[in-house]
Amino acid sequence: MKLEKISKPIFRHAGGSSDNIRIRTLTDAATPSIMGINVKEFPEVHSVSYRFLSKTYHGVGVINQNNGIEFVGQDLTDSPMTLNSSGVTFLPMEKEHRSDKLCIFADMMDYLAYQTLQKNGFVRVPSDCDFMIMSDVRNFIHISVEGDDYDMVYLYFPNDVMGCTITKTLKDRYGKHAIECNPLYKGYNNLLQFVKAIEITTNSK
């Protein structure tokens, strides 16, 4: 299997110093809402700001397993970015208990899109799941092995060549335990675009 590299920036601040990045617990004064969901409901999501070339960027992020940060801006207009080290992000449903279901996403934006569907009930999505965010194609082997431990694995990858290749490869690996979720957002590049289209339609009524 040959996968094209995801075109995603990895920002490493000068000299390895963390002075340019600030991580805070979400508060009322911090970023409270993205796509209509209160991100403070998710303890794994933090308020993140970083400074680069005299400009400060604000948004939210989660910490991956290599202590890097998967960052998205408040308005979701830019691509997600990894600050420091790339790595898989594992978000268990419960800290001390592994679910028998796993949802795998290409990036954090699709994870937030899923949470929007879960909250607003636009369409039915699986619940009571653990979550894994791949973030970079170099993490593919890691996520494929992790999925072996679950009874059901829901695959939320983009409807592009790379996403379809990953979906098919994981489907072949997990067999009947894998559910391809990209038909849900057929006609859209990814889950985020699908959710944004639903919100536009809903708000225009």
Regions found by a protein language model. Give the residues of each.
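Conserved hydrophobic helix-helix packing surfaces used for dimerization/oligomerization
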Residues: 23, 101-103, 153
